Design a protein with these regions (language model features):
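Mature extracytoplasmic or otherwise solvent-exposed domains
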Residues: 2-284
Length: 284
């Protein structure tokens, strides 16, 4: 799973080397956090799948039967995709970003970042971005059978603090697509997608972070089919900032699919980050 930072846009008169170094340090720590989260999800999925395999053995379910159930799961998955409505078009907001001057920041943002995508054996596996010009992030992960996949990408914004004061940061995103999770009693599915907001200081260390879960379905003997057509999601954090210091605000989309036999899933979250609002010296 390759990770990378995209082309950066810098505020006027800013020290480009300083900001580039900040981006590199913070992104390195961001990836460590991603790897930790990935391990936790994989460990939880592995434990649940082992329980299902044990149940199959206890019930005497033989391989031919499992193959038949897997075939039925694939048919249900393909039927759900065929019925999915087409996502509506979202026009990017045509306003220039203030690049960390405070207030509401619209696209274009400072730079895109990509934590990478791992497709496993999924039949559908692609990213929508990341695109700092439009704020488009997210991925389309889907398929059937025993496999797993994940994607993590987003955009980022510079912020310069002029005083020692509390800072409130919020982001708003519109989501288009579909969340689908289906598993037979002998199958297993874990389908997950979220919106993340993370803040890093001038040393590249995380000082605040939060997650808003958009889609989360897991287990066996489960069926869920949810459509998104411009659904709005927000995330916000509060952090005490230091004077005369640069910060970098990351907004990301993390998507994950893990499947056992006789299961299908789709995490298709085409996400547009519409704004990042920054309020310093906020009351309360």
């Amino acid at each position: 799973m390759a990770s990378s930072l995209g082309k950066m846009t810098f505020p006027r008169a800013a020290d480009k080397k300083l900001l580039t170094d900040l981006a590199n340090r913070s992104f390195e720590n961001l990836m460590k956090e991603f790897e930790r989260k990935q391990r936790e999800l994989q460990r939880a999925s592995r434990t649940r799948k082992e329980m299902i395999v044990s149940s199959q053995a206890i019930l005497g379910l033989k391989k031919p039967a499992i193959a038949e159930l897997s075939s039925k799961a694939k048919a249900r998955y393909e039927s759900a995709l065929a019925q999915r409505p087409k996502a509506g078009a979202l026009r990017p907001i045509a306003r220039a970003s203030t690049y960390g001057a405070g207030g509401i920041n619209y696209p274009p943002y400072s730079f895109p970042w990509n934590g990478g995508i791992s497709c496993g054996g999924l039949s559908t596996c692609s990213q929508y971005g990341p695109n700092a010009s439009s704020g488009q992030i997210g991925a389309d992960l889907g398929g059937t059978g025993a496999t797993s996949a994940s994607s993590w990408d987003g955009i980022a914004l510079w912020y310069y603090s002029q005083a020692n004061a509390p800072m409130v940061i919020s982001t708003q995103a519109a989501v288009y697509g579909q969340g689908y999770a289906n598993a037979d009693i002998y199958g297993y599915v874990y389908a997950y997608g979220d919106l993340e907001l993370l803040v890093y200081d001038g040393s590249g260390n995380q000082v605040a972070g939060t997650v808003n879960v958009i889609y989360d379905q897991s287990g066996s003997f489960i069926y869920n089919n949810t459509y998104f057509n411009g659904n709005m999601y927000t995330a916000n954090v509060s952090v005490q900032l230091a004077a005369n210091q640069w910060y970098v605000v990351y907004v990301g989309s993390y998507d994950y699919v893990d499947l056992g036999a006789a299961a299908g899933a789709q995490v298709n979250l085409d996400t547009f980050v519409q704004q990042i609002a920054i309020c310093d010296s906020c009351p309360g």
